[in-house]
């Protein structure tokens, strides 16, 4: 089923060329289908690239998805035109009165800055707090996952001496969660960050559970026990070239970055990059949208109290 996006959004042409089913708002208005309403808070510098990556995953699910794009209202985007932002993005004041089936909060290039020192931290906290009452399920990616664990559960992160960049093997640590349905016992996922959360700190928290982790990259999938918040420590949305682009950007800035691990053939940055994570990245978002959004969200979004209790759904999910 299609992902519904604003007319003329630049990502549309890219996705259509990849045979991803997208639908304009005009066309979707003529269909009598209750789409899943998903809000995306895009904190990444290249807004259009990130939009395309996330819409690619949402467009590969069997559900019709109606997407709104959200920005921090007083933060200027240095890498995306103001015309694009004003045309396709909403401010929080435009949506705070609404309810959504899902919210995705992206990563951000803020890995070495204390959360409290992030200039728009108060806005992030406000949106996270709002989401707990107005959204069925929240998907936090990379930096946002760390920020969410810190704000909601009081867990802090450790700053790494070197950026963790590359594609790492992960293993399932739980066997019977719908989120992991169809996953192999081991799978790949990309990481690009300057910090990490301690796996044992997460395990010891009574409201959290670790569903997948890596010996090299640590915790990857963390789910709150009320099934409302999913924290993904990596970047399942990344396209094949993203780590390469980041590596060469850092080289150009004189940062002397490490070569992304397990990414280039024979770990040679002059060789071809190999994408090993796309199938599981797609499956992750599809399972989240199906089992943790679609099957739990109320038909009438104005009444979030009508959300189906998770316990009653487990009996029907083998």
UniProtKB/Swiss-Prot annotation:
It comes from Shewanella sp. (strain W3-18-1). The record marks 111 as: Important for acyl-CoA specificity. GO terms for cellular component: cytoplasm. This is Homoserine O-succinyltransferase. The record marks 192 as: Important for substrate specificity. Pathway: Amino-acid biosynthesis; L-methionine biosynthesis via de novo pathway; O-succinyl-L-homoserine from L-homoserine: step 1/1. Substrate binds at residues 163, 192, 249. Its EC number is 2.3.1.46. The keyword Acyltransferase applies. Transfers a succinyl group from succinyl-CoA to L-homoserine, forming succinyl-L-homoserine. InterPro entries: Class_I_gatase-like, HST_MetA, MetA_family. GO terms for biological process: L-methionine biosynthetic process from homoserine via O-succinyl-L-homoserine and cystathionine.
């Amino acid at each position: 089923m299609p992902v519904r996006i604003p007319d003329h959004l630049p990502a549309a042409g890219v996705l259509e060329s990849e045979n991803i089913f997208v639908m304009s708002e005009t066309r979707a208005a003529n269909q009598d289908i209750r789409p899943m309403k998903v809000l995306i808070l895009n904190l990444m510098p290249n807004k259009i690239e990130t939009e395309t990556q996330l819409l690619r995953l949402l467009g590969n699910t069997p559900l019709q998805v109606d997407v709104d794009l959200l920005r921090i209202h007083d933060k200027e985007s240095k890498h995306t035109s103001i015309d694009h932002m004003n045309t396709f993005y909403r401010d929080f004041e435009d949506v705070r009165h609404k309810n959504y089936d899902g919210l995705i909060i992206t990563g951000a290039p803020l890995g070495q800055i204390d959360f409290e020192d992030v200039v728009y931290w108060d806005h992030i906290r406000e949106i996270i707090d709002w989401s707990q009452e107005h959204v069925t399920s929240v998907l936090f990616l990379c930096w946002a996952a760390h920020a969410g664990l810190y704000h909601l559960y009081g867990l802090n992160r450790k700053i790494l001496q070197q950026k963790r960049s590359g594609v790492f093997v992960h293993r399932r640590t739980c066997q019977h969660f719908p989120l992991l349905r169809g996953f192999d016992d081991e799978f790949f996922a990309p990481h690009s960050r300057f910090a990490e959360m301690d796996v044992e700190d997460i395990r010891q928290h009574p409201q959290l559970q670790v569903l997948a982790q890596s010996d090299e990259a640590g915790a990857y999938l963390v789910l709150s026990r009320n099934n409302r918040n999913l924290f993904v420590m990596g970047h399942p949305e990344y396209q094949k070239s993203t780590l390469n682009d980041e590596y060469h950007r850092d080289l150009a800035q004189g940062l002397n970055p490490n070569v992304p691990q397990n990414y280039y053939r024979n770990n040679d940055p002059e060789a071809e990059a190999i994408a090993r994570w796309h199938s599981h990245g797609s499956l992750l978002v599809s399972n989240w949208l199906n089992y943790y959004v679609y099957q739990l969200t109320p038909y009438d979004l104005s009444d979030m109290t009508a959300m189906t209790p998770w316990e009653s759904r487990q009996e029907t999910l083998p």
